[in-house]
């Protein structure tokens, strides 16, 4: 009889496995409370130096977050994270677009200007590329000579597009000094019926620009996420080995860099992340991880840790690789390490309902990141699709074949080789069209606040400290959803599939 070397049990012992839970496995235990949901404070910290009024980030996916959605997120108090399927020049331009969106005084280096001798056609194309509707006209020494707007240009595009800007511009320019206040600038614009005022120094040289839109946006969005200069905050995903991109977006003004890797508990990734952290001024969040050991490997240098190995709706990592960690357990394990060190935790993926977001925070997360939840909004870049008379928007995982072909293979530590067939870890799909991001975010944050009210927690730190969980059986999960009825009027924050 052959000698059986497996009698020591070293393999069968692997099957004595710990339990791991996800959102549907648990519920928050209601507790005595004096906290009204509207009074619950959801302000939080997502990295060492970045605080938000709402604990929500949009995912760095090419069908979710580009500058338009990032601007909308920041205005509502959250943070948009620009995806990495863009070349460096384009992502720098996207960062600058976010930073320029709500500035009170746009700094000179960010002001789009025209020269008197340029053609009307060239300036029209320039303004279209820069997404602005007007520009000061300046000489070589930056002396303001006029101002030109899309309204000035429009008649010339039909009959005189080769005419010089000096022919089309308004040369009687209303300017303002460097110390002008928002109120004074607004009054000046109303008085002269103009939408933009160049800011000049004593020599009449251009030093900045104030716009009506910028002032009104700042007034409307009092809880917006802003940096120390009053500009909207923005995050950027960078590949784990792309130091050049990290440096470029840091110089462009990005507030947080997200090391964007499906498995950040890779020693090569960690070494490179340390180097990136040392080379930039922005905060650096490392992810994704899913275990206590992974958190221990990065907690000494990371400004934040992002959690999620395969929980996303379009992610196939767990079935393709057989690897992953259910999200509630993953968040709690990482938080056990990160919280004592004062490092924020971001739960990334698997959140279908606002209650899932509340559970993630109660389990130790400081904020949540969502993809499909925002992919169906107006501001997301995915194209609109109509199927069976219903509108959807394109949504795909960054591990899908399409996303990898667009440059996302770096996230999965795979070479970008056109001759090699990809092994995807995601799918391409569609998500129902939802309307504005502000409406979706309102429902999400409102659900989190209601969860805090049930627990009796008036702040995110109190919620994390005081919340308790109970296990839920399969019957309990069924009981928790609408049952034994036919839904006739859909609620804005619920669908049976969690769409």
Curated annotation (Swiss-Prot):
NAD(+) binds at residues 260, 308-310. Its cofactor is K(+). Keywords: CBS domain, GMP biosynthesis, Metal-binding, NAD, Oxidoreductase, Potassium, Purine biosynthesis, Repeat. GO terms for biological process: GMP biosynthetic process; GTP biosynthetic process. K(+) binds at residues 310, 312, 315, 479-481. InterPro entries: Aldolase_TIM, CBS_dom, CBS_dom_sf, IMP_DH, IMP_DH/GMP_Rdtase_CS, IMP_DH_GMPRt. IMP binds at residues 313, 348-350, 371-372, 395-399, 425. The keyword Coiled coil does not apply. Pfam families: CBS, IMPDH. Gene3D superfamilies: Aldolase class I. Residues 106-165, 169-225 form the CBS domain. It comes from the Archaea. Mycophenolic acid (MPA) is a non-competitive inhibitor that prevents formation of the closed enzyme conformation by binding to the same site as the amobile flap. In contrast, mizoribine monophosphate (MZP) is a competitive inhibitor that induces the closed conformation. MPA is a potent inhibitor of mammalian IMPDHs but a poor inhibitor of the bacterial enzymes. MZP is a more potent inhibitor of bacterial IMPDH. One of its GO terms (molecular function) is metal ion binding. Pathway: Purine metabolism; XMP biosynthesis via de novo pathway; XMP from IMP: step 1/1. It catalyses: IMP + NAD(+) + H2O = XMP + NADH + H(+). Catalyzes the conversion of inosine 5'-phosphate (IMP) to xanthosine 5'-phosphate (XMP), the first committed and rate-limiting step in the de novo synthesis of guanine nucleotides, and therefore plays an important role in the regulation of cell growth. Homotetramer. Belongs to the IMPDH/GMPR family. HAMAP family: IMPDH. This is Inosine-5'-monophosphate dehydrogenase. It comes from Halobacterium salinarum (strain ATCC 700922 / JCM 11081 / NRC-1). The gene is guaB.
């Amino acid at each position: 009889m052959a000698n059986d070397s497996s009698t020591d049990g070293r393999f069968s012992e692997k099957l004595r496995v710990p339990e791991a839970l996800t959102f549907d496995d648990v519920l928050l235990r209601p507790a005595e409370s004096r906290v009204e949901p509207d009074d619950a404070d959801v302000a939080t910290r997502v990295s060492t130096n970045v605080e938000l009024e709402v604990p929500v980030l949009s995912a760095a996916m090419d069908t979710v977050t580009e500058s338009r959605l990032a601007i909308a997120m920041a205005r509502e108090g959250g943070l948009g994270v620009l995806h990495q399927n863009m070349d460096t020049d384009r992502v720098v331009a996207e960062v600058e677009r976010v930073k320029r969106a709500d500035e009170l005084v746009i700094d000179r280096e960010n002001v789009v200007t025209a020269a008197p001798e340029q053609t009307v056609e060239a300036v029209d194309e320039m303004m279209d590329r820069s997404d602005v509707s007007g520009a000061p006209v300046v000489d070589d020494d930056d002396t303001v000579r006029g101002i030109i707007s899309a309204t000035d240009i429009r008649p010339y595009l039909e009959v005189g597009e080769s005419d010089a800007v000096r022919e089309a511009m308004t040369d009687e320019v209303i300017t303002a000094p460097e110390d002008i206040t928002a109120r004074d600038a607004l009054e000046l614009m109303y008085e002269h019926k103009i939408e933009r005022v160049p800011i000049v120094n004593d020599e009449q040289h251009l030093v900045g620009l104030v716009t009506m839109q910028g002032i009104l946006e700042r007034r409307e969005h009092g809880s917006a996420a802003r940096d120390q200069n009053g500009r909207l905050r923005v995050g950027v995903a960078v590949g784990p080995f792309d130091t050049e991109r990290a440096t470029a977006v840091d110089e462009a003004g990005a507030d947080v860099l997200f090391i964007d890797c499906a498995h950040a508990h890779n020693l090569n990734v960690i070494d490179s992340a340390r180097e990136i952290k040392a080379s930039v001024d922005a905060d650096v969040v490392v992810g994704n991880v899913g275990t206590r050991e992974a958190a221990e490997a990065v907690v000494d240098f990371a400004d934040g840790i992002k959690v999620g190995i395969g929980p996303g709706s379009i992610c196939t990592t767990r079935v393709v690789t057989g690897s992953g960690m259910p999200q509630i357990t993953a968040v709690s394990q990482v938080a056990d390490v990160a919280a004592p060190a004062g490092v924020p935790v971001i739960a990334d993926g698997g959140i279908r309902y606002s209650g899932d977001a509340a559970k993630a925070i109660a389990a130790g997360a400081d904020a949540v990141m969502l993809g499909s939840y925002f992919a169906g909004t107006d501001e997301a870049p995915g194209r609109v699709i109509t199927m069976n008379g219903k509108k959807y928007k394109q949504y795909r995982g960054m591990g899908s074949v399409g996303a990898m072909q667009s440059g996302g293979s770096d996230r999965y530590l795979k070479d970008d080789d056109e001759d090699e067939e990809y092994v995807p870890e995601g799918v391409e799909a569609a998500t129902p069209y939802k309307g504005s991001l502000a409406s979706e975010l309102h429902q999400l944050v409102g659900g989190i606040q209601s969860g805090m009210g049930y627990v009796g927690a008036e702040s995110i730190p109190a919620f994390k400290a005081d919340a308790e969980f109970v296990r839920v059986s399969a019957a309990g999960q069924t009981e928790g959803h609408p049952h034994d009825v036919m839904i006739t009027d859909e609620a804005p924050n619920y669908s049976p599939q969690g769409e």
